[in-house]
């Protein structure tokens, strides 16, 4: 699938400083966009206040800048988009395409872990809000991993678009934001690969142009455990970006330029960038947590 012009993005959540795992996603999406002569946007996904760390968003942006990963256009903050999310939900509720659900996580686990739509016709006026999933997607093509499929039961589920605590769900926000900014390809970590099917469902149901997808291997300190802010992955060093940039290039299977500045390294990395060289694996074990 080809698009013109190319628009990519990096969308971190401000739950801590940028670490090596998130640098891989940032660098991979940046190189892909720049190698296509396209734009690279940055969006701060700050719609989950309990998980957010004060000052983390600004720290992430300063780190991107220190690493030469300069974004195009205006920054988007999801916290400034809540009126748009609510307006969409109001339309969905009014049209019968969404409904309130009062099922607990424990109740859903008791029936096998997949929600069965039992609240769809009950007329609740409070609780979580679920989409009536009319555009189910159980497979898609990934630009690195190839054909990806999910279980039919997962694809068919009426998933949550607004939580019972009043917070907007990731699936709704990311689809509306990608559509708003005209994203043509999403390049991100493989931990979100299954979520793409749900996002594709929303793109289709809302009549939005869906992007292409490319999911990069995750950096893991041990099998099944990606580097993350939650497990205290070491932040990358803003004062000395070259070693981490070179390590991230190596992780992505790219040649390491003989460069002594961030600018020259990235310029050569863009020129050399090859998707075919990226390992087609969901995770790669690395030494340590940095």
Swiss-Prot record:
Chain positions of motif 'HIGH' region: 12-22
EC code(s) of this entry: 6.1.1.-
GO BP terms: glutamyl-tRNA aminoacylation; tRNA modification
Zinc is among the record's keywords: yes
Motif ('KMSKS' region): 226-230
Cofactor note: Binds 1 zinc ion per subunit.
Cofactor entry: Zn(2+)
Residue positions binding ATP: 229
Keyword Iron: no
Record-level Gene Ontology MF annotations: ATP binding; glutamate-tRNA ligase activity; zinc ion binding
InterPro entries the record matches: Glu-Q_tRNA(Asp)_Synthase (IPR022380), Glu/Gln-tRNA-synth (IPR000924), Glu/Gln-tRNA-synth_Ib_cat-dom (IPR020058), GluQ/Sye (IPR049940), Rossmann-like_a/b/a_fold (IPR014729)
GO cellular component, one term: cytosol
Chain positions recorded as L-glutamate binding sites: 9-13, 45, 170, 188
Record-listed Zn(2+) binding positions: 101, 103, 115, 119
Keywords assigned by UniProt, alphabetized: Aminoacyl-tRNA synthetase, ATP-binding, Ligase, Metal-binding, Nucleotide-binding, Zinc
UniProt superkingdom: Bacteria
Family to which this protein belongs: Belongs to the class-I aminoacyl-tRNA synthetase family. GluQ subfamily.
Function: Catalyzes the tRNA-independent activation of glutamate in presence of ATP and the subsequent transfer of glutamate onto a tRNA(Asp). Glutamate is transferred on the 2-amino-5-(4,5-dihydroxy-2-cyclopenten-1-yl) moiety of the queuosine in the wobble position of the QUC anticodon.
Protein name: Glutamyl-Q tRNA(Asp) synthetase
Gene (name only): gluQ
């Amino acid at each position: 699938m080809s698009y013109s012009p190319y628009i990519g993005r990096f969308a971190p959540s401000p739950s801590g400083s940028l670490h090596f795992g998130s640098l891989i996603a940032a660098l991979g999406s940046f190189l892909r966009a720049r190698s296509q002569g396209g734009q690279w946007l940055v969006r701060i996904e700050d719609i989950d206040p309990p998980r957010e760390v004060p000052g983390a968003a600004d720290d992430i942006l300063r780190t991107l800048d220190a690493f030469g990963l300069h974004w195009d256009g205006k920054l988007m903050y999801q916290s400034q988009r809540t009126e748009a999310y609510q307006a969409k939900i109001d339309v969905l509720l009014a049209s019968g395409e969404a409904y309130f659900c009062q099922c607990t996580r424990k109740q859903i686990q008791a029936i096998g872990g997949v929600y069965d739509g039992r609240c769809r016709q009950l007329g609740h006026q409070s609780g979580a809000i679920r989409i009536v999933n009319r555009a189910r997607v159980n497979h898609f093509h990934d630009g690195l991993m190839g054909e990806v499929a999910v279980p039919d039961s997962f694809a068919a589920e009426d998933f949550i678009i607004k939580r019972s605590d009043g917070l907007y769900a990731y699936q709704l926000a990311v689809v509306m934001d990608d559509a708003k900014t005209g994203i043509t390809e999403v390049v991100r970590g493989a931990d979100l690969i299954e979520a793409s099917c749900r996002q594709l469902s929303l793109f289709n149901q809302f009549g939005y142009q869906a992007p292409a997808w490319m999911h990069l291997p995750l950096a893991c300190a041990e099998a099944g455990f990606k580097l993350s802010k939650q497990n205290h992955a070491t932040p990358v060093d803003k004062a000395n970006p070259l070693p981490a940039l070179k390590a991230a290039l190596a992780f992505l299977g790219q040649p390491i330029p003989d460069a002594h500045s961030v600018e020259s390294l990235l310029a050569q990395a863009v020129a050399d960038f090859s998707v075919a060289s990226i390992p087609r694996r969901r995770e790669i074990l690395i030494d340590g947590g940095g």
